Amino acid sequence: IIKVKNAIKTKTKIECIYNDKKRELYPLKILNLDSFWYLINYDLEYNEIRRYHLNSIKKVELQDIEFDFDEEIISGFDNAINAYFEPHIKPFSIELFLDKKVSKYFLRKPINQTQRVLKTYEDESIDIEVFITDFMEIIPLIQSYLPYIMVISPDELNKTIKSNLEEYFSKTT
């Protein structure tokens, strides 16, 4: 991990083994997503930014090749909620209603840096806005807090969650 950190700091290309395959990577950032550590990197083979589970990276070797990368893309990962974050997709707004039973938790620890309160109700329930890049960034969180979270918008997110619940209940009854 020290070699990876050094490569990020010096913007140096690395070679490593990931999932039993040799990789050439441009390491960009180490990030904790859902309690797992990931290396955010530009992978030459796929010609895209990828997330690799940090503990699965083996035999790291620094190369004598330095690189530059768009800092805006790298800083975009600061708003990632989980590994479903998509760096090349423009973030879009979702709005949620948070019942008073859970609102304090989201005020204490925001979902990500884009969270803002749109409305506070007398009973301490709130409406919030958050920016995401993929529905799967937020669906697990919403489903874990049901019935205390409701989707205000977009409607497609609401339909996806409803479909997930219908599928679940069809298998359990």
Regions found by a protein language model. Name each.
Residues 1-95, 104:
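Core beta-strand-centered patch of the WYL/Sm-like small regulatory domain
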Residues 79-173:
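Polybasic (Lys/Arg-rich)
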